[in-house]
Amino acid sequence: MSFSGGGYRAATFDLGTLSFLNSIHLDGGRTLLDCVVALSSVSGGTIPAMRYMLARARGEGVDKMVEELFGFLCNEDLMTDALQRLSNEKANRDASSIKIMAEIYDRLLFGNSTMADIIDNFDRNPVKDYTALATDFDNSLPFRFRLTEGKMSDGSRMTYGVFGNQKHSIGRSVVRHITPGEAMACSSCYPSGFEPMMYPDDFQVMRHDELVSGIKSRFGLMDGGLVDNQGIEPILLAEERMRKYRADKSRTDKALDLIIVSDVSSPYMEGYAPSEQALPDSVGRLTLGRLRNYGLISEVVVMLLFIVALVLGSNFWLGVMSVILAIVTLANIIGAVLKSKMFAAIRKTFVGDRAAFISHLKFATIEAMLMNRAKSVIMMSSEIFFKRMRQLNYGAIYDDKEWHNRVVSSTVYELRPGERWESMKRNGTLADYLAPSEAVQQNSALAASMGTTLWFTAEEKAQGMPQALLAAGQYGMCHNLLDYIDAIEKDGTNLTEGHRLLVSCKPQLLAAWQKFQENPRWMVPDVTRS
């Protein structure tokens, strides 16, 4: 299972996915969640994933963990806490907001635990391969905070913490001292909101002199969504490893029966439109050349008035004109210096010696050029780049015939009004009972409307946004598992015993879906603080 990035939108939706899988029971006291052996997370999705890994290590009940984490997401004001901490920091250029966020996560969410707490209790966890994904800002490669279980030559099991990539890695002795909050902060460190988290400077290993002395490389880490916002690549790596080391060497099919992708990103985007003029028309018609002429004219006029006051012998007007003349002259000098520096900077770009032509451009034209370029760059980095990466990530599994009948995706937007389910219902590829009710559609529309932030605003809380997102993750997983079971009942190729186990859960899924149709939030716990 992979949890996508997307701030609190992803964290809450993915938590809903996790909680629903834990509600479907199998024989022997297990749940569907207990069948998840490989887990990856990116950015906001790392919040529920890392907390789940620690809960398993501590032997905590999953339902209790879900309720506590949902309360944390709904009620804790992390940004205010972080800003207060940042303002109290001693004034220095190394003050780091992401380091402070990591410390807050560790204190409020993880109880000041370390990776050693998860590693030493890995046998309690059904997940045998977990990766929290970040991006190495030294070489643009994925940086994996990866925990795996392996076998020793004598048959005993050993848990490994493999943190890094082909260029940078963190030694195993140091891995034990990395905290869950630090890994989570790196994974969710979005460029527009935070600076890179520097290793080892911003990590608690700096408190251990014996560890720091052996660290040779220094590098920055940021949001894993920059390289893989769906977290699919770590799952494929986990599958390769499991296939290599599985007991039955005669099997050649995939080692994983099913990949579940819990995803809050969207394939849709608004098309580009030029920005509208913000400058008043009177200002927009000006040019740098005309502004310079106005400055010179005003200086001449003030100088003439100064001479008139001098001839008339008026000390009052002489004083007033002296002050005005000084101000106008100073303004012209400052303007000339700034213009000279601006042109010098522009000449270093592709414009070169043609910089002088800018003097003839109207301010409205300059505004349009700057705003439209800024808008297109932001759109390219925050929309087009991520949409294309999403297509490539999904293509890695959906375009591979070996994954046929082994992929389920659950997305936050798919059950809104006007989505693909409507055309599927019309052409008969979606069972009538899976058409979402009006209540489910409206809840999905609300859930999908949230932006990518690491908090819920007061307005969003008043709207019930956290509850809508948790519910969307729950009924979305239910809906997609039912749709998947319908599909494999018609096409039984590339299936295993694990799929028959999933099909046996259909009565529970049907009962839950009927409840969701009537009340989409029937599974959402009440965590409202009085």
Residue ranges and their predicted role:
Residues 1-530:
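Catalytic domains of lipid- and phosphate-ester/thioester hydrolases
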